[in-house]
Design a protein with these regions (language model features):
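A bilobed periplasmic-binding-protein/Venus flytrap-type ligand-binding module shared by bacterial periplasmic
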Residues: 150-157, 193-196, 267-280, 299-303
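Bacterial lipoprotein signal-peptidase II cleavage site
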Residues: 27-41
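Short, polar/charged alpha-helical segment
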Residues: 50-74, 248
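Periplasmic-binding protein-like
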Residues: 147, 207-212, 251-274
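Secretory targeting and sorting signals
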Residues: 1-31
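Mature extracytoplasmic/periplasmic domains
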Residues: 273-334
Length: 357
């Protein structure tokens, strides 16, 4: 079992070529805007960069990147589950340049199958959160951290929310608890794996979720529908990603968020296709550098202000948005993505067969 901590953990990202070093120099975080010069952007041949992303600010980011670099981006915005299905289905003939989703476990699984470019680390100043999160092979890059799961409730209807995970199993909350489907929602598998890690293993975690189902657990595809079930009165307690939960509170002052002990750290990350052309890999590296530049961080923190913008930064000099609680006030745990990532398919299959259905 991974020790429980009150510090956070993310990861890194994938492989460099000599051409990438030239491109990155023009988009270094040491610049005031994070944008490359027109001369450096024209130094390498441009091809469309295909971005698979489940981030709420991805449209704003890809537009800003294209404006800064002149590189055309084709964005496939979808939930994490369908994006991973596309990648695995086409792994012998891939059609993606980079993947940007929440959950390092997904990237560890891709890395262990040889699908990610290794060895690239952007030229940035990591804070302790970022430094702790870099995988040894540099096969993916952390871009931020959220928490999974936050407990969201209507404080006008629930005076005393559960204080522990075990209290969710009590008759008081029969039919009142909702969460997401891990086959659709990327943040949900790390939550399930985190509970298994906390409780002492897969079988004990399966027993916990089986008891939740017996107690009337309600499953919806993703954060949005789960929160809608809460606000409509179908459920009383929603277990969702912290960014979605805090965003919901910003929009509805009757809602509140609690963090049960412990919550699992959920890094967002970018990984590059190991089989992409060298030109597209170089552009993907420039994209990572742009995301982590001052200009890119402004886009991340403004592109989805009641959703994914509510993250904990991994860079020095970048502060989380004011709506977020101090991370030191929350008891968190880290899970090893290389332990849990390879089990994602098996655990999700079990969950869908035994809990969702």
């Amino acid at each position: 079992m991974t020790p429980i901590t009150t510090r956070t953990k993310v990861r890194t990202f994938a492989g460099a070529l000599a051409i990438g070093a030239v491109a990155i120099a023009g988009c270094s975080s040491s610049g005031s805007s994070g944008s490359p010069s027109s001369s450096s952007s024209s130094a390498a041949a441009k091809v469309p960069l295909i971005v698979y992303s489940a981030q709420g600010y991805d449209k704003a980011m890809t537009a800003a990147f294209s404006k800064a670099t002149g590189i055309q981006v084709k964005l496939d915005d979808n939930s994490t589950g369908p994006l991973l299905t596309q990648i695995y289905a086409s792994k012998n003939n891939p059609n993606w340049g980079l993947l940007w989703v929440d959950g390092a476990t997904a990237f560890a699984g891709l890395d262990q199958q040889g699908l990610l470019l290794k060895g690239f680390e952007p030229n940035v100043q990591w804070n302790s959160l970022g430094t702790q999160s870099l995988p040894s092979d540099k096969s993916y890059t952390p871009t931020g951290v959220t928490l999974m799961a936050a407990l969201v409730y209507n404080k006008t209807k629930v005076a005393n929310p559960p204080a522990t995970w075990q209290q969710l199993l009590s008759p008081q909350w029969k039919g009142a608890v909702g969460m997401n489907d891990p086959s659709q929602s990327g943040p949900t598998f790390p939550f399930i794996a985190g509970m298994m890690n906390y409780l002492g293993g897969v079988s004990k975690g399966e027993a916990f979720y089986s008891q939740l189902k017996t107690n009337g657990l309600v499953i919806n595809p993703t954060n949005g529908p789960t929160l809608q079930a809460l606000t409509s009165g179908k459920i009383e307690l929603a277990l969702v990603q912290s960014s979605a939960g805090v965003g919901a509170v910003l929009g509805d002052k009757n809602l509140a968020v609690e963090y049960l002990n412990p919550v699992t750290l959920l890094p967002s990350a970018i990984g590059i296709d190991a089989k992409a052309s060298s030109a597209e890999q170089a552009e993907a590296e420039r994209f990572v550098q742009f995301v982590l530049s001052p200009a890119g961080q402004k886009v991340m923190q403004s592109g989805d202000p009641t959703g994914d913008s509510l993250y904990y930064p991994v860079l020095t000099g970048v502060n989380p948005l004011p709506a977020l609680p101090s991370l030191s006030s929350v008891t968190t745990q880290s899970i090893n993505p290389y332990t849990w990532g390879p089990q994602e398919g098996t655990i999700n299959t079990w969950f869908d067969a035994n809990i969702v259905r």
